[in-house]
Amino acid sequence: MQTLSFLLALLFLVAQTPAQPTGEGEKGGTIQEPEATEAQDTAAVLMAAGAADGDDSDTKQLDTTFCRCRVSCNILEKYSGKCELSGRTARICCRKIK
């Protein structure tokens, strides 16, 4: 189930990433995009990781995981893979929301 959740998060990250301009047909230099800071999250994904185990079906709650592409993960976040942030390799940091 964790693998499926990770693949869904990765799919959403790829879908939300804007296409990079090739620069063909332009006279002059390349297009410069502003640098993203740690506070500016370029991708955020909310997903359901699965239902919590329990005897009573009425009391089951979904665990929700929040993932984003960052330079470094916070204390409560878990490293879940690599992503691209402003043309540089960054980390996918996830945390569970209850």
From Swiss-Prot:
Signal peptide: 1-19
Entry's localization field: Secreted
Function recorded in the entry: Has antimicrobial activity.
Propeptide: 20-62, 97-98
Keyword Disulfide bond attached: yes
Protein family: Belongs to the alpha-defensin family.
UniProt-listed GO biological process terms: defense response to bacterium
Highest taxon in the source lineage: Eukaryota
Keyword vocabulary terms for this entry: Antibiotic, Antimicrobial, Cleavage on pair of basic residues, Defensin, Disulfide bond, Secreted, Signal
InterPro entries on file: Alpha-defensin, Alpha-defensin_C
Protein name: Defensin-A1
UniProt note on tissues of expression: Highly expressed in intestine, and expressed at lower levels in lung and spleen.
Cellular compartments per GO CC: extracellular space
Disulfide bonds, paired cysteine numbers: 67-94, 69-83, 73-93
